[in-house]
Amino acid sequence: VTDLIPRQVLFGNPDRLSPRLSPAGDQLAWIAPHEGVLNVWVAPITTAEGADLAAARVVTQDTDRGIRFFGWTHDNARLLYLQDTGGDENWRLYDVDLDTMQRRDLTPFDGVQARVVASDRKFPDQILVGLNRGNPKLHDVYRLDLITGELTLDVPNPGLIGWVADAQLVVRAAVKPQPDGG
């Protein structure tokens, strides 16, 4: 009789996943469990050998479902991450300031799903996000000021499903499926 693979091995949380180097190359972030829930950790890179894992700190404090999607802002000062509530897939976009550890909900809308559309290092204080505020099936593009948190409608969605932005954070193309799904 072959031993079964334990469920924890197949479905449990990984030890570490999604490593991301900061834009300045001086910090490493990754997702790992904290008190049994996946959160984002950050460690300084202090030597040529790599990050000082003993100095790692948890920068998010999720106690429920865990965090799976995150990224650095281009100013090296903050991390962005997506989080839903109870598996509803209405993702909110949050940031955490790595100096103050202050967290902000950048898309505080009930029943709305946020998606990061584009960011660019030439615009470290801005990103484009898709929000389905007006129609649950369509994500309009908003420009988000990462300093003030202000959202400005950039491009309304006329019935497309995706966007392509250039390096100037200007939406240049849209993606729409064919009637046959192709």
Region annotations inferred by a language model:
Residues 1-16, 43-68, 73, 86, ...:
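Multi-bladed beta-propeller domains
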